[in-house]
Design a protein with these regions (language model features):
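Cytosolic juxtamembrane N-terminal segment immediately preceding the first transmembrane helix
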Residues: 7-31, 238
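Extracytoplasmic gate region of multi-pass secondary transporters
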Residues: 42-46, 242-272
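C-terminal ends and interior cores of transmembrane alpha-helices
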Residues: 96-111
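Glycine-rich segments within core transmembrane alpha-helices of 12-TM secondary carriers
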Residues: 150-178
Length: 272
C-alpha cells in the first residue's frame, strides 16, 4: 500500500510472489482431492466386496477398520519421516505407498482373497496418513498466516467434493455392468466377473498415483524449513498433555471422525 500525490491510498500486489504461490496451491489442491477420493472410496468398496466375497456384515466392516487403523500406528512414524526427508519428499513418498496399495488390489481381485484386500486397505491407509501428515501443515505454511484458514477451507471443500465424485466413478467403472440383485446367490462366473471388473480401474488408479507422485517430486514446490526438535519425546508428550484444550480437541475429533465414518461409509450396506 502506498500514498499517491493526491493523498489516495493505492494497493499494489506483488505479482511474482502471487504467481509463485499459485502453482504450489494447485498441486496441493490435487493432493487434497486424492485424499478425499481414497477415503470416500471405502463406502463403495465395502458393500461391493461384501457381495462379491459373500461376507458377513462384521467381515465387511473390516474393510473400513483396516483402512482407518493405519492412522493409529503410522501417524507418529509419518511425522518422524517427514522431519528427516522434508514435506515435499514426504508427499511424494505418501503417493508412492498409495500406488503400491493400488497394485495390491489387483492380485487381491484375481485371487479373490479377502486378506489381500485388507492388506491393500491397510497400505493405502498408511500412504494416505503419510500424505496427509505432510500436506496439512504445508497448506498452512505455504502462504501468509492470516489467510491460512481460507486455504484450509478451500482444501476441505475439495476433499469433500471428492467424496461426491468417488462413488460416481466407482459406479461408472465397476458396478454399471453388474445387474444381479443384492440378495441373489451369485454364480462362480458372476463372482469372477465382479472380481475382474476391479483390475483395470485399480491399475489405472495406481498409474495415476505414481505419475502424481513423480510430479510432486520434480515439481517446483518450495521445501519448507524443518522444525527443530525441542526436548525428548517424553518432554513433548508432557507438553501436549499439559494443554487440556488440545487433548479434548483431539478426543473430539476422534469421536467425530468415528461418527462420520459410520454414517457415510456403512450406509451402503443398508442399500444392498
Amino acid at each position: 500500500i502506498k500514498a499517491t500525490g493526491e493523498g489516495i491510498m493505492e494497493m499494489t500486489v506483488d505479482t511474482p510472489k502471487v504467481r509463485r504461490s499459485i502453482l504450489p496451491m494447485v498441486i496441493v489442491a490435487m493432493l487434497f482431492f486424492v485424499l478425499g477420493f481414497a477415503t470416500w472410496l471405502n463406502g463403495s468398496l465395502m458393500p461391493y466386496l461384501k457381495q462379491m466375497l459373500q461376507l458377513t456384515p462384521l467381515q465387511a466392516s473390516l474393510v473400513l477398520f483396516s483402512f482407518y487403523i493405519a492412522v493409529t500406528f503410522t501417524a507418529l512414524p509419518s511425522a518422524w519421516l517427514i522431519r528427516r526427508v522434508g514435506y515435499k519428499n514426504g508427499m511424494a513418498l505418501g503417493m508412492a505407498v498409495m500406488m503400491l496399495a493400488g497394485l495390491l488390489y489387483i492380485p487381491a481381485a484375481q485371487t479373490q482373497t479377502f486378506g489381500l484386500f485388507l492388506l491393500a486397505q491397510l497400505v493405502i491407509g498408511a500412504g494416505q496418513t503419510l500424505l496427509q501428515t505432510a500436506v496439512n501443515p504445508y497448506v498452512v505454511k505455504i502462504g501468509p498466516e492470516d489467510t491460512a484458514a481460507v486455504r484450509i477451507s478451500i482444501m476441505g471443500i475439495l476433499n469433500k467434493t471428492a467424496g461426491v465424485v468417488a462413488p460416481l466413478v466407482f459406479t461408472a467403472l465397476i458396478v454399471s455392468g453388474f445387474t444381479a440383485p443384492a440378495d441373489a446367490t451369485l454364480t462362480a462366473d458372476q463372482i469372477d466377473a465382479m472380481a475382474a471388473s476391479l483390475v483395470l480401474p485399480y491399475l489405472g488408479l495406481a498409474a495415476f498415483l505414481g505419475l502424481l507422485g513423480l510430479a510432486v517430486k520434480y515439481s517446483p514446490l518450495p521445501e519448507l524449513e524443518k522444525e527443530s526438535d525441542t526436548g525428548t519425546g517424553t518432554d513433548q508428550l508432557k507438553a501436549v498433555l499439559a494443554k487440556p484444550a488440545l487433548v479434548f480437541g483431539v478426543l473430539s475429533l476422534f469421536v467425530y471422525v468415528a461418527v462420520e465414518v459410520i454414517a457415510g461409509d456403512t450406509i451402503g450396506l443398508f442399500a444392498l
